Amino acid sequence: MGLEIGAGASTIWFARRCCHLSSIEHSEKWHRKVQDWIKKKKLEPKVTLYFAELASPGIPNPYLGAVKKIPNGSLDFVLVDGKYRDAVALASTNKLKSGGLLIIDDVHRYLPRVIPSSAPFARSNLAGCASDLWREFEELTASWEQVWRSDGVQDTVIFIKPIGG
């Protein structure tokens, strides 16, 4: 069972490979487009696609609210590729099963890496994390195995939650 923050082509890819995928999208236009793809590919039974408007002053973060409703230890993977990445990544750590995967796309914009990235807008070790929430996330996942991938334009990281963690 997986959770995807930010729907798109990856929604179809993951839906074909997992038992059930919940996906949250903030763009109404993009939500409709992905919903059409899901119907055309006959994946409706395997995908629950949610629309969550962006947060406004005085209105709680809808992405974060959706993540908080998920039972702890219930997800095999989380893909973070949408808005509020820092808050969502941090909140998702407890939602993963032991050995679960937390995948963050475009991570070079938010977290530095030991071996510097050549991706544009990459964070240096000197600059550190992009926010206090990212710093907290980095500390929380420091003991997790990490697999970094880059195509020179963007970086993606897979964090593997420790067994028993």
Set out the residue ranges of the language-model regions.
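Short catalytic-loop micro-motif centered on adjacent basic/acidic residues
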Residues: 1-2, 22-24, 76-80, 103
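SAM cofactor-binding core of SAM-dependent methyltransferases
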Residues: 1-56
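Short beta->alpha connector loops
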Residues: 6-9, 82-86
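Short amphipathic alpha-helical segments and helix-helix/interface helices
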Residues: 11-15, 31, 35, 67, ...
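Surface-exposed interaction regions that form or flank ligand-binding interfaces
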Residues: 53-69
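A short acidic, Gly/Pro-enriched loop at the edge of an enzyme's catalytic core
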Residues: 67-77
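C-terminal substrate-binding/active-site "lid" region of AdoMet-derived donor-dependent transferases
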Residues: 77, 83-165
